[in-house]
């Protein structure tokens, strides 16, 4: 009875973000356990270590009476959903600071969100080669004079999706930071057609690749009243961890 009484009076602790919303530890832990199960089936030795990832969360009581997560242990496996989620939070925080500093130095500059794709779908054996070619094409693109003359910096991430037939499709998501002059005059502004032609040239492809480009604007629906806040929201997508 004492055990039942103690359990009934236990306080459930929650780790919340700065907006007061609970962080999805349970969801990520379930994904982690599923990943550990796959490793176990394949007889990987690290399955046990992955299974124990973030099993214990230690909270610290703050002076105001609230509690805050201050310690846990991660398996640090590259494909662990829990570790990737925490890594994405860290990367997002660091990226937000970088964007804020960039905006402070160039207050009139603008952010552009660019998606670059290619038609080819590849198997696992050829994926590494195609990713290398895609990266090479991207650096050719940003060094073209039409792009580089107004480009102040960029953040790039690679997304790989799986097709129904088991092949892979790779594409790039890029957050560009450009001078305000980019939006002034035909000699500076690049339309979607311009970006498509430049990307086709960089890829050395015989087909027109799919390219999407849009200026980052104020997101009033989410209460983002400044251009920088909207860019920060976009940047979070840049470092979003994959689903497993």
Give residue spans per PLM region.
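Short, cysteine/histidine-rich loop/knuckle motifs that typically chelate Zn2+
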Residues: 81-85
